Each structure stands twice: as C-alpha cells, then as structure tokens.
Amino acid sequence: MSLEQELIELVSKEALVDVEKLKTDATLEEIGLDSVDLVSVVFAVEDKYGVTIGENDLEKTATLGDMLALITKKIDEKAASEKGSA
C-alpha cells in the first residue's frame, strides 16, 4: 500500500468519511472534515509516523491533496534527519 493510500485510509477511519469521497482535489470542507476531525487525523498521523504537524502548517492546507503533501513532507523530513544523525 502506498503512503498516500495509507493516509487516505487513516483520514477515512479518523474522520468517519467514506474512502470513495476522499479525492485529492476535494477541499477539506467538501469532504466534510471539521476542526475536530482534523485534530483527530493530525493526532493519528503524529502517533503513527512520529512527526509533528503544527497549526501554521495546517492553515496552508485547502485540499486533501495539500494535507497529504504536508504529511508526506513531514515524514520525509523526519526520515532525512534520522538518516543524517545516524
């Protein structure tokens, strides 16, 4: 399973949204994610991948694709920093 698919599954589970509704070009509002759902998703991502996602980062996400790109970037940054400190 790709990282994008893992994240879509996680969003679906945490926000109780049908996977079929989760298109990367859909806005978070169109998907039906409210602030509580977003916090649940962020906590789940932080727990699963060991990354930190700040409020300022989230303010820049308008679509599911934006959110997935942000999470992927955070995961990649964490992996690079761990590799650099090894």
Regions picked out by a protein language model, each given a short descriptive name:
Residues S2-I31, V41-V42, K48-A86:
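Phosphopantetheine-dependent thiolation modules in NRPS/PKS and related acyl-activating systems
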Residues D37:
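Two-component histidine kinase catalytic core, primarily the HATPase_c
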Residues D34:
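Conserved ATP-binding motifs of the histidine kinase catalytic
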